[in-house]
A protein has these predicted regions:
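Domain-level detector for secreted/extracellular nuclease and nuclease-toxin modules, and
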Residues: 74-366
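Short, surface-exposed linear motifs at loops/turns and structural transition points
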Residues: 1-77
Length: 366
């Protein structure tokens, strides 16, 4: 068919079999282009170019459309705090450029930190009773991630807490001390949280402490960074003898590894509770009861970088406390074993070639 071109463009969609969206192109010779908007990050799109041609002579009232072959492209993932190496794989609700942008990273929304002049970033998950939060602090004129966690409204507990540490750069140990700045976490509604303005009441003959998941001594870079470890969301009802015994001993050993982790090395830590079997309960300052974990675990991965963003090696190990009612030393195990126990996929952003070996190792760092 001969005639004149009246329109060019693309039809497109996330489904190759249903290209229902149209973007009209600019008719200015060949090739032509069109702009697409409202795309979702990390998504594959399919498209076909089209040309509309109006006939001549006795076909002048006829407009025919010709289509090219189907092609595809994938949009880049949005930069989020969830892309850091310490973060377990967590299914969050979709993000787009219409969501909150903070310091070059996207989240569903953000809120001012109680301590410091930065913001906490909040992510919705596919479970309405769970949210992911990343706390941040300011150091050396930039915003730095402090720690992230997956919080569960039912247990009123973070199911995992993840952070990076070393003795250089953004996490340098400046020995700012313990600030005891107990406070509700500004990133979550207070109804989701335990009231830990004071100690737990004794329950079933067990005395529970407000047990840190990220230890105060793990965060010694700035005062604000340390204070954020006293948010109630970072606490669990932990058997007092365990919290002040084998648990703190493990924390000290982790801090010892962090102290000698400098330069191109970073230690990534994920810790969390177990909720298995019949659970004891603890009573907070408001008289509300909450489940006490049945045990705890801690996973470590020490990574070396040959250049910024290029990881060259990784070693891993894990520690398991099978009980929250005695002061028994942890069992040395593998990250794989903790993944099987909890259902989480740890260190999901570490390259698979390094992650697989590191997660199957069972020797202790100390």
């Amino acid at each position: 068919m001969t005639g004149s071109v009246t329109e060019v463009g693309f039809r497109w969609s996330t489904s190759s079999g249903n290209l229902g969206n149209t973007a009209t192109g600019t008719l200015n010779g060949t090739p032509f282009s069109a702009s697409l908007s409202g795309l979702t990050a990390g998504t594959t799109y399919y498209y076909q170019a089209y040309v509309k041609v109006q006939g001549t002579g006795d076909k002048s009232s006829t407009v025919s459309t010709f289509y090219g072959s189907t092609n595809s492209f994938t949009t880049s993932s949005l930069n989020t705090w969830l892309s850091n190496y310490e973060i377990p794989a967590t299914t969050v609700a979709s993000l787009s450029e219409s969501n909150t942008l903070y310091e070059g990273r996207y989240c569903h929304d953000s809120v001012n930190e109680t301590y410091g002049n930065t913001k906490a970033c909040r992510y919705n998950t596919t479970d309405a009773n769970q949210k992911v939060v990343t706390h941040t602090y300011s150091y050396n004129s930039k915003v730095v991630r402090n720690y992230s966690f997956l919080y569960d409204k039912t247990y009123k507990t973070a199911l995992w807490v993840a952070y990076a540490t070393s003795n250089s750069g953004d996490f340098k140990d400046n020995d700012v001390g313990r600030n005891d700045a107990w406070a509700y976490d500004p990133a979550l509604d207070q109804s989701w949280q335990q009231n830990l303005s004071g100690a737990y009441s004794s329950s079933n003959g067990l005395r529970y402490d407000r047990g840190h998941q990220v230890a105060s001594n793990d965060r010694q870079t700035t005062v604000e960074q340390n204070k954020q470890t006293f948010y109630y969301t970072n606490m669990t009802p932990q058997y007092s003898a365990l919290n002040q015994g084998q648990w703190v001993e493990l924390e000290k050993k982790v801090q010892g590894v962090a102290t000698v982790t400098t330069g191109s090395d970073t230690l990534y830590v994920v810790t969390g509770p177990l909720f298995e079997g019949t659970l004891a309960s603890a009573t907070d300052k408001s008289g509300a009861t909450c489940p006490a974990p049945s045990g705890y675990w801690k996973c470590l991965m020490k990574c070396t970088f040959s250049s910024p963003g290029v990881m060259s090696s990784a070693v891993g190990c894990a520690y398991l406390f099978d009980t929250n009612s005695s002061n028994i030393a942890p069992t040395v195990t593998t990250i794989d074993a903790i993944e099987s126990r909890t259902g989480f996929d740890f260190f999901a952003n570490v390259p698979t070639s390094l992650q697989t070996t590191a997660e199957s190792q069972s020797y202790s760092f100390f």
